[in-house]
From Swiss-Prot:
EC supergroup of this enzyme: transferase
Keywords: Acyltransferase, Cytoplasm, Transferase
Miscellaneous note of the record: In the reaction, the free carboxyl group of octanoic acid is attached via an amide linkage to the epsilon-amino group of a specific lysine residue of lipoyl domains of lipoate-dependent enzymes.
Name this protein carries in UniProt: Octanoyltransferase
Organism phylogeny: Bacteria, Bacillati, Cyanobacteriota, Cyanophyceae, Synechococcales
Catalytic reaction annotation: octanoyl-[ACP] + L-lysyl-[protein] = N(6)-octanoyl-L-lysyl-[protein] + holo-[ACP] + H(+)
GO molecular function, one term: lipoyl(octanoyl) transferase activity
Presence of the UniProt keyword Transferase in the record: yes
Annotated organism of origin: Prochlorococcus marinus (strain MIT 9301)
A Pfam family this chain is assigned to: LplA-B_cat
SUPFAM superfamilies from the UniProt entry: Class II aaRS and biotin synthetases
List of catalytic residues: 175 (acyl-thioester intermediate)
NCBIfam families: lipB
Length: 216
């Protein structure tokens, strides 16, 4: 496969989910209009918020929306409710799957493989689970995946817990999985930091999708 150009954005600051989601949608629409436009990758952290997929069950929010102290967004992706916060690294991929494989199951499994390679770079043994989407360390979930797709142009992506406040997941039923335990990478490798993980995420995506990155 020939290399494809992708714009990559890696802010150092903690970013608003609303602003980054709007940016993704803009790149998605640009690719739909003209697939010669570059793909778009965003790697960073969010302020504390909760997001629900298109068909999410609000019963999986364990707090009232009427007096919520947190931002809650319903967005264009599959899957159930999840949480974003500082200390968790989020990666969004706005890709034209027509250049790769027009198969969403292939894409989900590809993302799982990418996450497993990222954690493997830090000597963390992890795995996918049959019947579920995401990546686990033993019986604890370390990474969540949620994607949207319109005319084969993807949106959203995956999150990896690096060193975040896992208590925030207690306010939801994560990914709709009852009694789901969550994990942080830092608990399995004390020497890592989020900037180093970010570097490996970029490198792995670049290699797996044959991208030539343009920083922006």
């Amino acid at each position: 496969m020939d290399n494809r150009t992708a714009i990559i954005k890696q802010p150092d600051n903690i970013s608003s989910f609303h602003d980054v989601y709007k940016l993704q949608k803009e790149y998605q629409e640009a690719l739909i209009l003209d697939n010669s436009n570059p793909d778009f990758i965003w790697i960073g952290e969010h302020q504390l918020c909760y997001t629900l997929g298109r068909g999410s069950n609000y019963d999986n929010l364990l707090f009232s929306l009427n007096d919520a102290k947190y931002d809650v967004f319903k967005i264009d992706r599959g899957g159930e409710v999840t949480c974003h916060m500082p200390g968790q690294l989020v990666t969004y991929l706005v890709l034209d799957l027509k250049n790769f494989n027009k198969d969403l199951n292939w894409y989900l499994r590809k993302i799982e493989e990418i996450i497993i390679k990222i954690l493997g770079a830090f000597n963390i043994d992890c795995h996918s689970r049959k019947g579920f989407t995401g990546v686990w360390i033993g019986n604890k979930k370390i990474a969540s995946i949620g994607i949207g797709c319109k005319k084969w142009i993807t949106i959203n992506g995956f999150s990896i817990n690096i060193d975040c406040e896992l208590e925030n997941f207690n306010k939801i039923v994560p990914c709709g999985i009852e009694n789901c335990l969550m994990a942080n990478m830092i608990d399995y490798n004390k020497n890592l930091n989020i900037q180093e993980v970010k570097r490996i995420v970029k490198k792995t995506i670049e290699e797996e999708f044959n991208f030539d990155f343009i920083s922006k």
